[in-house]
Every structure is written in C-alpha cells, then in structure tokens.
Amino acid sequence: MATQDTVLGESTAHIQGLGGAVTVLRLDGLKTLLDSGYVVNYAELVVPVREGSNVRYAAPSSLSILQVNGSTKTLIRDYLRGNPGGTFTASGVLRKGAYRFVVTRHVQDLLRYGDTASFKMMLVPERMASSPARAVLHGSADAVEPMSLNLWYTKPN
C-alpha cells in the first residue's frame, strides 16, 4: 500500500466486505471550479468493474460513498434525499458493468462550503460487515475505462 500513487491514481482499485479493502477517492479536480461562477446541475460518479473479475466471486450488489473529514466518515448528503444509485449493473458472460452514483448535492456542497481537505471520499460495500462480496475496479489511471466524475454545469449571467 505504501507504493500507491496518490497523485496520479492507480489503474486498478479494490473493494471487499468483511473488513477488507475500501477505495479512497480525491476530487481534487473540483478545485478548478471553486470561485468560477459555474453551477453544477448534475453530477454522476461512474466506477467501472474490471471485466471478468466478478465471475468467480460476486461483486457487492451496491456501494456507498462516505465523505472523509479527518477521522470522521459520514454518508454523503445525496443519500438523505432518495436513491443516489450505487447499484451494480452488469451484462454479458464476463459480467462487464459499473456502479453509478448521483452525487449532485455532494459536489454542490463541496463547491459552496467545503474546504479542499474535504474533497476526499471512500467507496465501501453497502453491507461491509456482513458480506464477503468483492470487486476489482478500474482506477482513475486506467487507460481504457477509468473511473470518472461526469459534471453537467452552467454559468449564470
């Protein structure tokens, strides 16, 4: 773990229940939008699962996103108002798929109130304590299908 690239990211990330691996994300790219005047209309986090990695062992049926602020971890605000997504959708023999999250409120809050230290999030299996399900994810440095934060935004007059 000491050899992980915390600046450029990794090509592969892992998630596993029963006290196993979690994935930490930093949304440092959002810093460029601070004080820009842009308004985020919709934000979606897409986390692709490496094709074929969940044939032998099932992937978690859904993931949760926690905001990390020092040693405190809390569910992001989007979970308090309806379904933010995070369910695994797959197709084909090799179970190619992705987790998709609606994170609009969280991104808006970060841009409005957050300091840059709060741009850190953690992906965890929804039933972390009771399920051994695991997944191999495409990391942010994956050349073919990286994790992505898709933003739809406008600049008011």
Language-model-detected regions and their locations in the chain:
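Secreted, disulfide-rich extracellular signaling modules
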Residues: 1-157
